[in-house]
Curated annotation (Swiss-Prot):
Belongs to the HisA/HisF family. Disulfide bonds: none annotated. IGPS catalyzes the conversion of PRFAR and glutamine to IGP, AICAR and glutamate. The HisF subunit catalyzes the cyclization activity that produces IGP and AICAR from PRFAR using the ammonia provided by the HisH subunit. It is found in: Cytoplasm. One of its GO terms (biological process) is L-histidine biosynthetic process. This is Imidazole glycerol phosphate synthase subunit HisF. HAMAP family: HisF (MF_01013). CDD domains: HisF. One of its GO terms (cellular component) is cytoplasm.
Length: 257
């Protein structure tokens, strides 16, 4: 059985790590490289970096910090932000990233998923999905441009259908960003994760809602996700990654210590 992954997420804006609540009101957390180094030393299995305004600003992630991160950590890391072409992805991978993640650009041009998978292999291609539960309709809807409050908008895709579509096109992994839970620390949306897990046959990473160690255990054991991504609990040192891994091992979760 493959070990479950713990994945700190660093949202990047203007060269600094920031964190919002439900994708709004971002506060500055600190500099990218020292945080990345700290998480790697604490025992993170992987890191994810989102340049959160790259897509809405119509630019590609700033590559200068990608190279600096690659120099100081020895764990895999994934980079997202405005990657719209094979050339964009190639440059980020050349700078040292192990994977690229696409979100809004995949919604604008679904064929991009296939192009990237064909060129770099599916293991390099992650699709991020920003999913919002609309209480009025009772549906999970995919959103676009969520890094910019003024431009974020619903798409025509329901989450389950988009999960099926991106797999068909070559996604090697899916990160499900559950917008209603983001930064609230009340736990991952297990109902939504189970709905997606039923139709997701590639590694699935839960994102949005981690507040306590038990939330990680629940995601692994009750929704069978492959990894759990979190930001604020790590940034604010509410949870230490080494201690979290020890706790998960005691809960009989397969984890790398």
């Amino acid at each position: 059985m493959l070990a479950k992954r713990i994945v700190p997420c660093l949202d990047v804006r203007d060269g600094q790590v920031v964190k919002g609540v439900q994708f709004r009101n971002h506060e500055i957390i600190g500099d990218i490289v020292p945080l990345a180094k700290r998480y790697a030393e604490e025992g993170a299995d992987e890191l994810v970096f989102y340049d959160i305004t790259a897509s809405s600003d119509g630019r590609v992630v700033d590559k200068s910090w990608v190279a600096r991160v690659a120099e100081v950590i020895d764990i895999p890391f994934c980079v997202a932000g405005g990657i719209k072409s094979v050339e964009d992805a190639s440059r980020i991978l050349q700078f040292g990233a192990d994977k690229v993640s696409i979100n809004s650009p995949a919604l604008a041009n679904p064929a991009l998923i296939t192009e990237l998978a064909d060129k770099f292999g599916v293991q390099c291609i992650v699709v991020g999905i920003d999913s919002y539960f609309d209480a009025e309709t009772g549906k999970y809807q995919v959103y676009q441009f969520t890094g910019d409050e003024s431009r974020t908008k619903a798409t025509q895709w329901e989450t389950r259908d988009w999960v099926l579509e991106v797999q068909k096109r070559g996604a090697g992994e899916i990160v499900l960003n559950m917008m209603n839970q983001d930064g609230v620390r009340n736990g991952y949306d297990l109902k939504q994760l189970n709905m997606v897990r039923e139709v997701c046959h590639v590694p699935l990473i839960a994102s949005g809602g981690a507040g306590e160690m038990v939330h990680f255990a629940d995601a692994y054991q009750k929704a069978n996700v492959d990894g759990a991504l979190a930001a604020s609990v790590f940034h604010k040192q509410i949870i230490n990654i080494g201690e979290l891994k020890q706790y998960l091992k005691e809960q009989n979760v397969e984890i790398r210590l």
